[in-house]
Regions:
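Conserved ABC transporter NBD signature motif
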Residues: 63-72
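Conserved ABC ATPase signature
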Residues: 138-147
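ABC ATPase NBD coupling module
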Residues: 72-89
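Short coil-to-helix segment of the ABC ATPase nucleotide-binding domain corresponding to the Q-loop/switch region
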Residues: 99-109
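Helix-to-loop junction immediately C-terminal to a conserved catalytic motif
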Residues: 55
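A short, flexible loop at the N-terminus of ABC-type nucleotide-binding domains that lies
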Residues: 1-6, 10-29
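Conserved ABC ATPase "signature" region
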Residues: 117-134
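ABC ATPase nucleotide-binding domain "signature" region
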Residues: 38, 150-156
Length: 156
């Protein structure tokens, strides 16, 4: 995927607001591959909604969202599975880790499905994030910050 485009998107929760003070909603916007973007808003401003729309968890919006010129409303379940396996990752506020499994097992569960990384690449991510010594520990015994890093590795 090279570009994500939003065209006059408005979350259903904001449908009754004629003009939203936002650079994301009710405007044309493009996110290009390889660039970094900061989406900042007050509580209730729609940051989590945007992520849910882009990951296909929710479709309660008006307007159009495109991945490489393809409207998300046209995606089948299989299309979403393929996109989530290879092209987009989402780290929810609820980390959705399995507390009784080790950090390595939590990451391996997704990688067994996608085969996206080999073991040495995954080990290098643990090292870069400073938690290589936590690989064999149950995630439920790690600090929240350490759990977040495990979830980041799994998402990548």
């Amino acid at each position: 995927m090279n570009i994500i485009e939003l065209n006059n998107v408005t979350p259903a929760a904001f449908a009754d607001i004629s003009r939203i003070a936002s650079e994301v909603w009710q405007s044309s916007l493009a996110f290009e591959k390889g660039k970094k973007y900061l989406v900042s808003a007050q509580s209730g401003g729609g940051k989590s909604s945007l992520c849910a729309f882009l990951f296909g968890y929710r479709a309660d919006y008006s307007g159009d969202i495109f991945f490489d010129k393809r409207n998300l409303r046209d995606f089948s379940v299989n299309d979403w599975c393929l996109v989530r396996q290879r092209q987009i990752a989402y780290l929810p506020q609820d980390l959705r880790l399995f507390g009784e499994l080790t950090a390595w097992e939590n990451v391996s569960i997704k990688n067994e499905i996608t085969s996206f990384r080999n073991d040495s690449e995954i080990l290098e991510m643990f090292r870069k994030l400073g938690i290589e010594d936590m690989i064999g520990k149950p995630v439920g015994k790690l600090s929240i910050g350490q759990q977040q890093r495990v979830a980041i590795i799994r998402a990548l």
